[in-house]
Amino acid sequence: MTEQTNQNPAAAAAQTGPIVNPQAVYIKDCSFEAPNGPFVANTTGNPTVNLNIATRTAPLTQDVHEVVLQVNLEAKAGDKVVWLLELQQAGAFFIRGLAGNDLTHVVNIVAPNYLMGFARATVADLVVQGGFPPFLLPLVTFEALHARAQQQQAAAAAPASTVN
């Protein structure tokens, strides 16, 4: 036996609330370089790894937004580059029922957090396939990155003070 409900469409739509669903996760661009292979001369210990992470977003349609997590890594032993990795881990997210700060929160914080696990696995796999021990991306606080970006935008938009 099935249960029947007599709800009008407007009431049903009101109950669904905001919707956020990943539609696709993909590598938009990727590059791994090991200029000297895994046998870098005169290296002892672990290399120093410089990490830069950035995000960017763009609407693809009215309800679908692309979020790109850009990860750049450079491993160096002294002045020698051991390996370089550039990754653009992207996702298309269906987002409906959100606007303003809520939409900004999803595309700048929630979506990059979702993509980070995929990026972490890709980075570890590429480094291992390059002949090196795996590198695990650290936890990233996208809330702090977003807050810093907003502060920088506000500072750039503020009028410069003049001294007479």
Enumerate the predicted regions with their spans:
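N-terminal intrinsically disordered, cationic/polar leader segments
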Residues: 2-114, 118-164
